[in-house]
Amino acid sequence: QGMRRLTGFDAIADEEGFIVAYPQGIRRGWNSGPGGTPDDVAFLEALAAQLQARYAIDPDRIYATGLSAGGMMSQWLACESELLAAIAPVAGTLPTPSADACARTRPVPALFIHGTEDSIVPFGGGNAGPADGFRPAEENARLWAAANGCGTAFEVEQLEEAAPDDGTTATRITYAGCPDAGAVHFYRIDGGGHTWP
């Protein structure tokens, strides 16, 4: 129920005509890395197959997003499965062992969002508790862009403030030279914490 309330996706799905699902990992977490249990990649693939059998879902238009561990899981699912058309992780960079083990065989478009003041999954990387070290947020996006076949150049754009009183600003970084099916955007939320934008 938390992500349903936080994202407001139900209303957007009704308005735009798409189906949204809110899977929940065991103990509010996900196995977003090599080995271990449960096999959350298999779980999410099975969930997608069940939804496709029940509803008219275009198999080429399945997307994943998530906050924190959910954002990490969206990336790991794209690393391990051909299921997704694109991802949009929020405040969730892959732990270094997962990033090193990512074996994507095709470009997967991505839109990353991360706050510079995130104290749970630090923007600058490193550790924030018992988890393995996280890659810095901008490096995580850059490495994804490189794996997609994008060039090293990027465009930086300061965005208009949607909520001038919230103490944050947003900057969009768009990687250049990406293949048509491999665009990568990174939204840096200056002053933003570990939260949904």
Region locations from a protein language model:
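Serine-hydrolase catalytic machinery in alpha/beta-hydrolase-like enzymes
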Residues: 1-63, 67, 72-76, 80, ...
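A conserved short beta-strand
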Residues: 83-93, 108-109
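Short, proline-enriched alpha-helix->beta-strand connector loops that line the catalytic pocket
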Residues: 105-110, 179-184
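Short beta-strand/loop motif that positions the catalytic acidic residue
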Residues: 112-114, 118
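Acidic, glycine-rich loop-and-strand cores that form catalytic or ligand-binding grooves
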Residues: 133-169
